[in-house]
Amino acid sequence: MSLEGKVYDYLNKAVETGRENGMQFVVFHKDKCIVNANVGYTDFSKTEKITEDHIFPIFSTTKGICATLVHIMAERGKLDYNQKVSHYWPGFKANVTVGQILGMTAGLYREQSDLIASDFLDWNYMASRMCELTPLETPGVNFTYHTMTFGWLAGNLACLASGKDFQTLLEEEIKQPLGLKNLYVGAPKEVAEKVVNIVDEPYINDGDFIVDQERDIKKGWCRGPFYQWMNTNLGRMSIAPAASGVSSAMDIAKHYASFVGYKKPLISKNQLIKALEDNRFSTQWGYRGYGYQFSFMDNDKSLDKVRFGHNGYNGSFGFCDTKNELSFAFNKNYKSDKTINGEILNEFYKML
């Protein structure tokens, strides 16, 4: 059986046994797509099959895309990881560096409690609110996950450095060079309406989320289940580069494949080393550098044997394996405690 056939067999079994409902799993080796598996259905009615062009909510997988934009600006000399944010951002009050924003050690992880979800449609307003944040911890000391604020903080730094709005920057620096057609942060309404919904089991309960743009977003987290926000056009049209991205797995995989041979590298190997080496914090998700999560292959802590990228709520992920020159992306639509997202990469490596 071919490698792709083995993957399809594994994914189909996950659907047949009720562990998953609909998935995309894409793998590139250097510049060649070696697995393009689209399995299952868009919802529990099982009437519409998942295809390569279906677009899914990718939640925090968006953070890796946002980080790449910052690294592009840094490589061009327009941002310095060690420079104060206020050097680039007029009116920014917190005494933190660009690197502390990227590494989530800035202590700016909590949005003001008076924000409402419709505010996320207005980039300039959200950027102005980031200016007012005060660190809740001593900057540079502890890693604390910046669930939502990361996107506006890091994203606006890239915008200020380039002189362009976020969506133009994404289009010109990532989508056009790589030929991506299904990646959006702040999707147009006609795209938002077609995004695959996240479906769940009745007993899954992350809280009492009310899909209402007049509800407050408090304590650094949208009141759950978090996915319900991204089951609305309001969520999908939000320009929130920490969590509101929508994409096909193919486009996410191409982004990471650019680091190992697909078309033109978005950043150089030297810049990638800076992104992973200059700021290394060990977290519950492995190591974290400037905007990327990463882990070492074979317990060899050298940066030519690293797997980096970002995962997202509900199991979406995009990663690059520099040792084996592989890139991966995974999308899924079933919110379940039986998910395969924690094991699919290990299973794939066994198939090689």
Give the location of each predicted region.
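Short, conserved catalytic-motif segment at the N-terminal edge
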Residues: S2-F56, K78-Q83
